[in-house]
Amino acid sequence: MPVVSAFYAALTALLCVVLSSLVISQRFGKAISLGDGGDPTMSRAMRVFGNFAEYAALVIVLLALAEILGVSRTWLHIYGAAFVLGRISHAIGLYRTPKPNLFRASGVTLTLAVLVGLAIALLLATLRKIG
């Protein structure tokens, strides 16, 4: 049972709700029903959510596959926690300002590190099973 990945999937789902709520509140507050209405804050809220969505499903699938293939729980927690923290950091950085900043940079760095780490872990686990 992939319980560790289920835990991070649940945290990711909650983060998804928070980020989509930011978009919804901007829409209501600015009476924008579709698109960004030319509003930079609305545009940033949409990109924060969109950027999150672009990575979330892939990371959760990779995490679940890693767990199924027997990657250690310690590493699964490291990858899962780093992903969630990275996405929170990126969201804070991008929502605050469109300019490059430490939150945004550290968020994308953590996210990409998790993707690379999980890819390597999956390759190694797969090679152990095949070989």
Predicted regions located by residue number:
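Juxtamembrane loop-transmembrane helix junctions in multi-pass integral membrane proteins
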Residues: 3, 41, 45-48, 71-74, ...
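Cytosolic, membrane-interface loops and tails of multi-pass inner-membrane proteins
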Residues: 21-47
